[in-house]
């Protein structure tokens, strides 16, 4: 049953029999902006949501792993690519879908990439080749815009922001 438990201020799912509280918390999405020379790795999604659109390799964290372990795992799963993490790069709060998106800068250990089970295509792109109109998620688009601005400026500061729900037309 959905109710406010004693000592809490928000409605929670509470078992009427044992009174156990089932907390529903935001999901963590982790991924990499993975670079080889002047190109970055993008994956064309083979699953919903946003089937057929491009994104960086990223996905939900698994229990028992760190954020950077999850980002490395997702890059391997989605693009059969091995990376070395450079630094934490961006964190985006996406409250309307209860997600927190964490991206790392990473170096590809070699340029050999190929699609994983959930990916239609994995490819390295120069900035001018990126299919900007076919990027799957606002968080990824924001991170890539910052990334290329930062590259031109010669420094990669940490970025943080909130992705608001798109307005209905």
Where are these regions (language model features)?
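Unchanged
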Residues: 61-146, 150, 154-156, 167-169
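Active-site donor-binding loop signature of nucleotide-sugar glycosyltransferases
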Residues: 17, 45, 58, 106, ...
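Short, highly charged C-terminal tails/helix-capping segments
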Residues: 160-166
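Short connector loops at helix/strand junctions that flank enzyme active sites
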Residues: 10, 25-29, 35-37, 49-51, ...
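Acidic, metal-coordinating catalytic segment for phosphate/diphosphate chemistry
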Residues: 1-32
